[in-house]
Swiss-Prot record:
The gene is alr. This is Alanine racemase. The modification N6-(pyridoxal phosphate)lysine is found at K34. Its cofactor is pyridoxal 5'-phosphate. Pfam families: Ala_racemase_C (PF00842), Ala_racemase_N (PF01168). It comes from Aliivibrio salmonicida (strain LFI1238).
Length: 358
């Protein structure tokens, strides 16, 4: 019996990708697999993501891992390259790059490369994190068109800051800014990530960039992915390693953060913050044991957490516990903890065993 394990349901991944295609039927899919495939395993997710057209990563190391693993589809560095020394690596491995600043532009202009690089010009349409400002757009376009190290035609992209907030006018403003700048351009364009492709159909351009929704987790606070017809790809599990009787008035765990108000049974589960389960999980955070939700009771330890099974519990050592995923959405757990499901799935540590289910 293993302790903590992340069961990765590859049929759920296939279902989610098919649903994305149905929602953006006229767009190519750039599947975002950064941060170790959102914690699901970079290479296994890439190999199982049948029917996508390209992959997006954040770091050049992630791109090289894809190439070393036999992935031949297009790969894009969403943040672009970090130094001029990266450029020969991009050429040698057929890796595409975003360009969002003058340092990257000048590095491309000054490089002596063996071939051109596919460039996505990243426009700051209103998020103000990365990208060239609208007033700089034409200068960048002209210089990139003139650069021998840049494959033509250029491609164009931007990123939303508030697409998960359906009442926020910023997203429509960003769409208008990006479309007005790039209208008439020869190259392909991309604007929508997960929230965009789900809620803002006008942002479904030549490419969409599904990230979190591909893994069956919602980008929206008010709806789970299952509410939207998507399936959780990850189910995080462990097992009960002890069932103990606790009397009313007795406290459990470090700092005595939880005190029982009744005689009850406590279940000890073999998972903790050393596995990536958040230490911040407060009393009451739900865990699924034998099909019912039971609350976390006491501070999460490095290797264990404790739950209140109830006075009449018939659970036994060895019974499975589900921390999130199947029948317990990660979004629900994240809300209790005061974080987002993105953080839950991406912070699992290496001692969590990855189990891939066809």
């Amino acid at each position: 019996m293993t302790a903590a394990a992340a069961q990765i349901d590859m049929s759920a991944l296939a279902h989610n990708l098919q649903k994305i295609k149905q929602q953006a039927p006229n767009s190519k899919l750039l599947a975002v697999v950064k941060a170790n495939g959102y914690g699901h395993g970079l290479l296994n997710i890439a190999k199982g993501a049948h029917g996508v057209d390209a992959f997006g990563v954040a770091r050049i190391e992630e791109a090289l891992q894809l190439r070393a693993g036999g992935i031949v589809k297009q790969v894009l560095l969403l943040e672009g390259f970090y130094s001029a020394g990266d450029l020969p690596i991009l050429v040698a491995n057929n890796i595409q790059t975003a360009v969002h600043c003058k340092e990257q532009l000048e590095a491309l202009e000054n490089a002596d490369l063996e071939g051109p690089v596919v460039v996505w010009l990243k426009v700051d349409s209103g998020m103000h994190r990365l990208g060239i400002r609208p007033e700089e757009y034409q200068e960048y376009v002209d210089r990139l068109h003139a650069c021998k190290n840049v494959a033509q035609p250029l491609r164009y992209m931007s990123h939303f800051g508030c697409a998960d907030e359906l009442d926020n006018p910023t997203t429509n403003e960003q769409i208008e800014t990006f479309m007005s700048l790039t209208d008439g351009c020869q190259g392909e364009r991309s604007l929508a990530a997960s929230a965009g492709l789900l809620a803002w159909p006008d942002s479904q351009l030549d490419w969409v960039r599904p990230g979190i929704i591909m893994y069956g987790v919602s980008p929206f606070s008010e709806k789970t992915a299952q509410d939207l017809g998507y399936l959780p790809t990850m189910t995080l599990t462990s097992h009960l390693i002890a069932v103990r009787e606790v009397k009313a008035g007795e406290s459990v765990g470090y700092g005595a953060m939880w005190t029982s108000e009744r005689d009850t049974k406590i279940g000890v589960i073999a998972i903790g913050y050393g596995d990536g389960y958040p230490i911040a999980a407060p009393n009451g955070t739900p865990v699924l044991v034998n099909g019912r939700k039971v609350p976390v009771a006491g501070r999460v330890s490095m290797d264990m957490l404790t739950v209140d099974l109830g006075p009449d519990a018939e659970d036994n050592v060895g019974d499975e516990a589900i921390l999130w995923g199947r029948d317990l959405p990660a979004e629900e757990v994240a809300e209790h903890i005061g974080t987002i499901a993105y953080e839950l799935v991406t912070k699992l540590t290496s001692r969590v065993q990855m189990q891939y289910i066809p």
